[in-house]
Amino acid sequence: KQFTKCELSQVLKSMDGYKGVTLPEWICTIFHSSGYDTQTIVKNNGKTEYGLFQINNKMWCRDNQILPSRNICGISCNKFLDDDLTDDVMCAKKILDSEGIDYWLAHKPLCSEKLEQWLCEEL
C-alpha cells in the first residue's frame, strides 16, 4: 500500500514520543526509507530490507535467503509488505529499543530538525 503522510500519521499515532522519538521524526524517516510504500524491498550489502521501516533479514525477520537469521522479531519478512502495520510497528519498536533511532540511516542527516513539514495538519 502507498500511504499518504496523513494516513500514516493516523496509523502510527501510538509511536509518537516512544523512546523520545516524535511522530514527525518517524514520518520523515519512513519517507526517506521507503517513500511510505509497504511494498518496498531493497537489497543492501548482502541483506534485504523490507517494508515501510526497511527491516532487514539478517537480524530482525526471516526470509530463507540468509540462514540463520537472528529473527529477533520472530516473523517472516513478507509480513512487512502487507497493509497491516501492527507487526511492523512492534518490530520497529524492538529495533528502537535495541539500536536507537540512528539504526535508520536517514534519521540523523534528514530528520533531526525542520520537522514541521512532516506534521499532518488534519490530526
Swiss-Prot record:
Q: Which domain of life is it from?
A: Eukaryota
Checking CDD domains in the record gives: LYZ_LA (cd16898)
Location in or out of the cell: Secreted
Q: Give the principal location in a single coarse category.
A: secreted
Tissue distribution of the protein: Mammary gland specific. Secreted in milk.
Q: What does this protein do?
A: Regulatory subunit of lactose synthase, changes the substrate specificity of galactosyltransferase in the mammary gland making glucose a good acceptor substrate for this enzyme. This enables LS to synthesize lactose, the major carbohydrate component of milk. In other tissues, galactosyltransferase transfers galactose onto the N-acetylglucosamine of the oligosaccharide chains in glycoproteins.
Family to which this protein belongs: Belongs to the glycosyl hydrolase 22 family.
Q: What is this protein called?
A: Alpha-lactalbumin
Q: Source taxonomy lineage?
A: Eukaryota, Metazoa, Chordata, Craniata, Vertebrata
